[in-house]
Amino acid sequence: RRPGSDSCRGAHPGTGQRACQGVHWRSGNRRGRTGALVYAHENGINYLDLATAGAKTFEYVGKAFSSVRREVFYQVHFGANYETGEYGWTTDLETIKRQIDWQLGKLKTDYIDYGFIHCLDEKSDWEDYQKNGALDYLLDMKENGIVRHIGMSSHTPELAWQILDTGLVDQMMFSINAAYDYQHGDYAIGSASERMKLYRRCEAEGIGISVMKPYSGGQLLNADTSPFGQALTPYQCIQYALDKPGVLTVLPGIRNKADIDALLGFLDASDEERDYSVISSLTPKDVKGSCVYCNHCQPCPAGLNVGLINKYYDLAVIGDTLAADHYHNLEKKASDCVSCGHCDSRCPFHVAQADRMKTIAEYFGC
C-alpha cells in the first residue's frame, strides 16, 4: 500500500497488505528518549504522528531523525498548539502559523510529509477552520512544496465524510478499535456502520488511514475497563485495526525502548496471538450499561453529541490529556443536558445517559 505518491516500507506478515510501521510518541522518561527513537528507526519504524502531549517531543524527534529525514514520514497537525508546553487545540490562524514555524525548527526539517487538518469533530469546527484561513494556509504550504500531502483527523464519521468530499485529503487519521465498533445483530446500528462505510470509501479512493487509539486509550487492555469484560492483547487490537479497509498504519503510543520492543514483537507474532475472534463469542449483554458510542440516541433534543462526550470522558479518566482538551472544545457539553430522557429511552445498551451526563459534567466542571 502506498501513502500518496511515496513508497512506504514494512510489511505486516499475514495481513495481506503493506503498512508503514508507525508510532505515536507519548510522554515518558526524559532519559533515553532520543535513543529510543533512533532504535525505533533502526528496527523499521518509519512513520511518526506528532499530535503529542508535550512540546519536548519535537526536539527529541529532530535530534533522532534529522540525519535520516528522507527515511521517515511525519504527521504534523495544523491546529495542535504547544505554546504552553503542553498540548492545546486551536483553529486560530496566527497561532497555527507560529506553531508550524516552531515545529519545523525543532524537527530540523524544511518539509512536512502529511500536514493535517487537526481533530475537527463538529461542523462548526470545520466552518471555523475554513473561515479563519487555516485551511488556505495549509493549501498554500502544499502549493509551495512544504507540505507534501494533506491529511485530516476526526472522531466523527459524518464530518470526516464531508471533509473527504473536498477532494483535498490523501490521508485520514481515525480511531479504530473494537470498543468503538462493537455491534451484534440487532445492535449493528449507528456509527459502527458509518465508520465501515468511511473506511471502504478511503480504500476505494486510495486515501490511507492511520489509526489512533488502537487500544481505546488502554481500556481494551484491562478487563476492568474493557466493554467486553475481558482484556484483549495489544497484538489482537493491532490486527483488528489492520484488517479494516484502507488502513495504512496503526499508531500505538510509545514511551521508551521497552514499548518499542513490545510493538516490534507484533511482526513475529503467530496467527493465534493476533486472532481477535474471541470478540465474536461475546453477546450484547456483556456491554449493557456501558456506552459503546453507537449514537443510537441521536439526535439529542438539546444538541449534545452523547457518544462523543462519553468517549472523551472515558479516555480522560484513564489519563488521556488530549481527550480532556477535546471535550472542553465541544460546542455542547454534558452540563447542557436537560435530562429529558430521550437518550435513556433509546439506548440499546441500557445506559442511564442523563445520570451519566451529570457525572461527566461534574468531572470536567462543565
Predicted regions and their residues:
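Short hydrophobic/aromatic-enriched beta-strand-loop microsegments
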Residues: 71-75, 168-177, 270-277
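Short, hinge-like loop/turn segments at secondary-structure boundaries
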Residues: 66-68, 91-93, 167-170, 190-191, ...
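Active-site-proximal loop/turn and secondary-structure-junction residues that shape catalytic pockets
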Residues: 19, 52-56, 78-82, 116-121, ...
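Structured C-terminal cap/extension of enzyme domains
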Residues: 3-6, 36-41, 45-46, 63, ...
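N-terminal binding-site loop/beta-alpha segment at the start of enzyme catalytic domains
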Residues: 1-78, 82, 143
